[in-house]
UniProtKB/Swiss-Prot annotation:
Gene label: NLP9
InterPro entries (alphabetical): NPP1
Protein's name in the database: NLP effector protein 9
Glycosylation sites: N176
Pfam family name, one: NPP1
Function statement: Secreted effector that acts as a pathogen-associated molecular pattern (PAMP) recognized by the plant immune system. Seems not to induce necrosis in Nicotiana benthamiana leaves.
The keyword tRNA processing appears for this protein: no
Example of a GO cellular component annotation carried by this entry: extracellular region
């Protein structure tokens, strides 16, 4: 089933009010109408999903090395809830709690200048050298309507050998209601596919955070409580960071789940509901 044929799909773009795109963070009052359940089908492409990037601050980017050591990558700061829009607040609210059962901890993959992580030089069976990152953790987010469900993707980068990207999708009813709820959760597993729970097992949820474990290069729903990481949404990344994450060669061909090439495809491939949620 092609994405272009899905019914009821709504993405966050601000052409509705004034006929032109604006930064999502410009005004919550304009955003309100854009995060309610859609009335009918909307045909869209990746160009209509949140595309605004944060401005770069480095004037000497061309002189920088494209790749740096995995433990030298500075993470993006997480916007405080009071400074965030409705969709950003929802992404912060539903951040999964990740427990590292076996493997490296989640590290920043790219910095503001677009320099990406090289990953580890040699494998460490004990994972001691890729434990908790000294410069801070990072989880990457991106969200959109898919059918009548608000999908929030969270993606983590692990600098092990080989490099690894994993993701979780938290499917919610609506970010713009007083009490949004989790309808389901999908995680990428160690077999290269996905596993879903609809709804998630209550024992695997802590408040509004699903509990997830990283184990043997894959994610799985868990009863063990982990921690949260600094969240940066796709549209909060600099242009340089977005471009680096969009390049297929950046991570030796390993898929970056939330980039322009894979975000919508992963939502479609991970869809865990019946057709009623598409109408």
């Amino acid at each position: 089933m092609k994405i272009s044929n899905l019914l009821g799909v709504l993405v966050v773009f601000l052409a509705v009010v004034k006929g032109q795109k604006k930064d999502e963070g410009s005004d919550d009052s304009e955003l309100l109408a854009l995060v309610t359940v859609p009335d009918g089908p909307v045909i869209f492409s990746i160009e209509q999903v949140e595309q605004v990037a944060a401005p770069s601050t480095d004037k000497h980017l061309s002189k920088l090395k494209p790749k740096i050591a995995y433990d030298k990558v500075e993470p993006f700061e997480m916007a405080q809830p009071s400074e965030s829009t409705i969709t950003e607040k929802a992404a912060i609210k539903f951040r999964p709690k990740l427990y590292i059962a076996n493997g490296c901890h989640a590290y920043p993959a790219v910095n503001k200048a677009g320099q990406i992580s090289k990953g580890m030089k040699t494998a460490d069976p004990t994972f001691a050298t890729c434990g908790k990152p000294s410069k801070g953790t990072q989880v990457y987010g991106r969200s959109a309507w898919f059918g009548t469900v608000w999908a929030i993707m969270y993606a983590w980068y692990f600098p092990d050998i080989p490099l690894d990207w994993e993701y979780a999708i938290v499917w919610t009813n609506n970010p713009n209601v007083s009490n949004p709820v989790i309808l389901g959760v999908t995680v990428s597993n160690s077999e290269g596919s996905t596993t879903s729970q609809t709804p998630p097992d209550p024992a695997m949820v802590d408040g509004r955070s699903v509990k997830i474990a990283y184990n043997n290069k894959g994610l799985e729903s868990s009863t063990t409580l982990g921690g949260t990481q600094n969240l940066v949404m796709w549209h909060q990344l600099t242009v340089e960071a977005q471009e680096a994450l969009n390049k297929k060669a950046s991570f030796n061909g390993v898929q970056v789940p939330m980039n322009d090439n894979h975000f919508l495809r992963n939502l479609e491939a991970s869809w865990p509901f019946s057709k009623e949620y598409l109408q």
